Every structure is written in structure tokens, then in C-alpha cells.
């Protein structure tokens, strides 16, 4: 049990050492200097929107395709 306790303390000490070597987190004081590109780049947020198309009077999420009859339908409704 003595060895297990020493091993536990060694692991905790090494964990603290490696944690202190990590990248520091910005404080609220330095929030003005935030350089996170995801928050300021609008193209990141626009890429998550669904694109809708108009297929013969129907709004389709995944685009249109033509059936064998030449009729336009939404792609997810059994187009060939």
C-alpha cells in the first residue's frame, strides 16, 4: 500500500506539472483581444443553413431531379 500511495502522489504531481505547461486560457480582461475565427467569420455560420430549391411548386431541401415522365420532384422522393 505504501508503494501505491507514492505512485498516486507521483501521478498527481506530474499531472499538475503538465497542466501548468499547457496553453493559458484568456481572462475576461483580455476578451477584447479574442482571436477566435469562428465567431467573426460569417461564412462558418452560413454553411450550416439548409439550401432549399423550388421544384415544380414544392420546396425541396436537397434539390430537384426529373422523373421518367419529365416531372420535377424533390430528390429524396424516389427519383431515378
UniProtKB/Swiss-Prot annotation:
Residues 23-49 form a propeptide. GO terms for molecular function: toxin activity. Probable toxin with unknown function. It is found in: Secreted. This is Conotoxin Vc7.1. Expressed by the venom duct. The keyword Disulfide bond applies. The cysteine framework is VI/VII (C-C-CC-C-C). Displays a mini-granulin fold, a structure composed of two short, stacked beta-hairpins connected by two parallel disulfide bonds. This newly described fold is derived from the same cysteine connectivity as knottins (ICK fold). The name 'mini-granulin fold' comes from the structural homology with the N-terminal region of the human granulin. The keyword Secreted applies. Belongs to the conotoxin H superfamily. GO terms for cellular component: extracellular region. Residues 1-22 form the signal peptide. Keywords: Disulfide bond, Secreted, Signal, Toxin. Disulfide bonds join 55-65, 60-74, 64-79.
Amino acid at each position: 500500500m505504501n508503494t501505491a500511495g507514492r505512485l498516486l502522489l507521483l501521478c498527481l504531481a506530474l499531472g499538475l506539472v503538465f497542466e501548468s505547461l499547457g496553453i493559458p486560457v484568456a481572462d475576461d480582461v483580455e476578451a477584447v483581444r479574442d482571436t477566435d475565427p469562428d465567431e467573426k467569420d460569417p461564412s462558418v455560420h452560413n454553411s450550416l443553413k439548409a439550401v432549399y430549391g423550388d421544384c415544380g411548386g414544392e420546396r425541396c431541401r436537397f434539390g430537384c431531379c426529373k422523373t421518367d415522365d419529365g416531372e420535377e420532384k424533390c430528390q429524396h422522393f424516389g427519383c431515378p
